[in-house]
């Protein structure tokens, strides 16, 4: 067995105008595919550890040292992107009632949540991700990680993710990351967020 690159659940151009087809094609077929290939190359060196990336990245000390950073970078990159694709929707969706209530409880209002999430995504220096997670106490929390690090390694369960690597937005938004973040909020798959939230609580 090997880690497989998942197909996008929609056409490359399905998220336009927010996310353009060329970016989606490059992002999925080149960047994500490279993470998958490099993950498999690392795992082949240690077949005894298996291929459950979520379990491995939940406690990176259990990953053999010679492939640990490769799996953090590439295994994390695969998991992060596989989740990211599912969190995007060609059809505009309203926030589901359960998630809306949880956001109100945690942040005071949806606008306050959006402001804090945007700040986390904008403030992540260099490459990384912004996240809405369910923490160990079962509470919603906004966080960000560098590079392809995953909140799973901190014992947190991601339910919303935004890739803020420049490869995710530079063709369309150039250096204006805030416009990309604003566009992201227009194409979130809130049904998937709800599904992840219910499973993580």
From Swiss-Prot:
Co-factor binding comment: Binds 1 Mn(2+) ion per subunit.
Gene3D superfamilies (alphabetical): Fe,Mn superoxide dismutase (SOD) domain, Iron/manganese superoxide dismutase, C-terminal domain
GO molecular function, one term: metal ion binding
Pfam families the UniProt entry points to: Sod_Fe_C, Sod_Fe_N
Highest taxon of the lineage: Bacteria
Record-linked PROSITE patterns: SOD_MN
Enzyme class of the recorded protein, top EC level: oxidoreductase
Reactions that this protein is recorded to catalyse: 2 superoxide + 2 H(+) = H2O2 + O2
Location of the protein in the cell: Secreted
Disulfide bonds: none
A Gene Ontology term for the protein's cellular component: cytoplasm
Residues that coordinate or bind Mn(2+): 27, 81, 163, 167
Cofactor(s) annotated in UniProt: Mn(2+)
Transmembrane spans: none
UniProt xrefs under InterPro entries: Mn/Fe_SOD, Mn/Fe_SOD_BS, Mn/Fe_SOD_C, Mn/Fe_SOD_N, Mn/Fe_SOD_N_sf, SOD_C_sf
Metal-binding listed as a keyword: yes
UniProtKB keywords: Manganese, Metal-binding, Oxidoreductase, Secreted
EC number: 1.15.1.1
Function: Destroys superoxide anion radicals which are normally produced within the cells and which are toxic to biological systems.
Family designation: Belongs to the iron/manganese superoxide dismutase family.
Record text on subunit structure and interactions: Homodimer.
Protein name (record): Superoxide dismutase [Mn]
Species, as recorded: Streptococcus pyogenes serotype M18 (strain MGAS8232)
């Amino acid at each position: 067995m090997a880690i497989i690159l998942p197909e996008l659940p929609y056409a490359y151009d399905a998220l336009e105008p927010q996310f353009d087809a060329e970016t989606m094609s490059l992002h999925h077929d080149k960047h994500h595919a490279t993470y998958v290939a490099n993950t498999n190359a690392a795992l082949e060196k240690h077949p005894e550890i298996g291929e459950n990336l979520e379990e491995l990245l939940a406690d990176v000390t259990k990953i053999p040292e010679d492939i640990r950073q490769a799996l953090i970078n590439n295994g994390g990159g695969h998991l992060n992107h596989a989740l990211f694709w599912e969190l995007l929707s060609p059809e505009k969706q309203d926030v589901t009632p359960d998630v809306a209530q949880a956001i109100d409880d945690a942040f005071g209002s949806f606008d306050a949540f959006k402001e804090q999430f945007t700040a986390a995504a904008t403030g992540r220096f260099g490459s990384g991700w912004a996240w809405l997670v369910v923490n160990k106490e079962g509470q919603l929390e906004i966080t960000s990680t560098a590079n392809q690090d995953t909140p799973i390694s901190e014992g947190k369960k991601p339910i919303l993710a935004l890739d803020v690597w420049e490869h995710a937005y530079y063709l369309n938004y150039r250096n204006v990351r805030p416009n990309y973040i604003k566009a992201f909020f227009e194409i979130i798959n809130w049904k998937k967020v709800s599904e992840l939230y219910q499973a993580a609580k």
